[in-house]
């Protein structure tokens, strides 16, 4: 008989659907409660609006990280594991991969325009993010009757493995929920957390697998995808009896120590105008360039630029100066 594993992953910024009315930057109240209520109303209105396209969540998110997430199911076939996929969304809260959602922009990543904590200064950003997640858990969401928190998943499946794959910014938001969920499991060793770059969190350290950029060469892909690629490796290679926090921490801790040091690049920062000129010249030579490929080339040429900044500059030039149909601008 196959063994069920509940997998919780965080959403991605890249999506197949867009909707300007569902961008958190447009809900600028400095009061958390007011902002959340306005956001919730907008989502409910979108659900009732037949002109706004909705898709299953699994098909809304995209990008290299999400491509790996979509391989989780096939990765478990030979191990006779059955997975149930859940998504932590800063916009919709906890949803299943089958939940019908619209395109939206909301995130717990503090550097972005649609950050949950942006513009709210009454308390610390960490507390704001926790409060936002708590508010989302109390909303019915797009699937009536389905779990709206990680704790609710555990209460429904107390004996099953819970694998949480997240970024550090999302770990902070869902931290209280995770601590409560851990205590609700029949065996706390069944909670496994993979959060690249985050080694410890109070009360959860015994559940957190070691994962950082040293795994990149072994797992392949971008460094930022190490957490989902490690999850894929575990799902495809480990027998169900070995998927518990204690065994995996020991095994992958030793494996991580065997990896070469993280490569350091001595790349040069240049002014924004020079970055734009670089993008412009390359697009003039090749109109089929994607932002992803051009950023890779830019870095290979010895220059440094954060992904989101480069993408924004790329899209700005694309829209204003070239009016080109760029095939792929996701990272």
Task: Give the label of every model feature segment.
Residues 38-108, 115:
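A glycine-rich, hydrophobic loop/mini-helix early in the fold
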Residues 268-289, 301, 314-326:
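Positively charged, polyanion-binding regions of nucleic-acid-associated proteins
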Residues 91-149:
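Long, charge-dense
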Residues 10-13, 165-169, 196-197:
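Structural motif
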Residues 186-221:
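Short, flexible loop segments at boundaries between secondary-structure elements
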Residues 291-303:
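DNA-recognition alpha helix
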Residues 1-59:
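A structured, charge-rich N-terminal accessory region that forms the first stable segment of a protein
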Residues 229-261, 269:
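Long, charge-rich alpha-helical interaction segments
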């Amino acid at each position: 008989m196959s063994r069920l594993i509940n997998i919780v992953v965080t959403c991605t910024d890249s999506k197949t659907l867009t909707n300007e009315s569902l961008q958190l930057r447009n809900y600028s109240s400095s009061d958390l409660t007011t902002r959340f209520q306005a956001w919730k109303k907008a989502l409910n209105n979108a659900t009732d609006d037949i002109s706004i396209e909705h898709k299953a969540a699994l098909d809304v998110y995209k990008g290299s990280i999400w491509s790996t997430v979509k391989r989780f199911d096939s990765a478990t076939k030979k191990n006779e594991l059955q997975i149930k996929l859940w998504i932590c969304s800063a916009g919709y809260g906890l949803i299943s991969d089958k939940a019908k959602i619209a395109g939206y922009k909301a995130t717990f990543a503090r550097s972005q325009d649609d950050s949950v904590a942006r513009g709210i200064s009454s308390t610390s950003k960490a507390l704001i993010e926790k409060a936002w997640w708590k508010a989302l858990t109390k909303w019915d969401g797009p699937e009536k009757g389905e779990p709206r928190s990680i704790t609710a998943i555990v209460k429904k499946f107390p004996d099953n493995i819970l694998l949480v794959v997240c970024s550090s910014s999302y770990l902070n938001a869902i931290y209280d929920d995770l601590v409560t969920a851990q205590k609700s499991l029949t065996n706390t060793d069944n909670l496994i957390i993979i959060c690249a770059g985050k080694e410890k969190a109070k009360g959860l350290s015994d559940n957190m697998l070691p994962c950082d950029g040293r795994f990149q060469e072994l797992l392949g892909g971008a460094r930022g995808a190490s957490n989902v690629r490690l999850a894929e490796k575990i799902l495809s290679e480990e027998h169900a009896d070995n998927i518990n926090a204690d065994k995996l921490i020991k095994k992958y801790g030793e494996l991580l120590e065997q990896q070469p040091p993280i490569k350091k690049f001595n790349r040069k920062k240049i002014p924004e105008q020079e970055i734009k000129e670089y993008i412009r010249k390359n697009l003039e030579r090749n109109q089929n360039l994607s932002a992803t490929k051009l950023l890779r080339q830019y870095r290979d040429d010895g220059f440094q630029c954060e992904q989101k900044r480069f993408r924004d500059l790329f899209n700005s030039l694309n829209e204003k100066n070239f009016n080109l149909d760029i095939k792929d601008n996701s990272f």
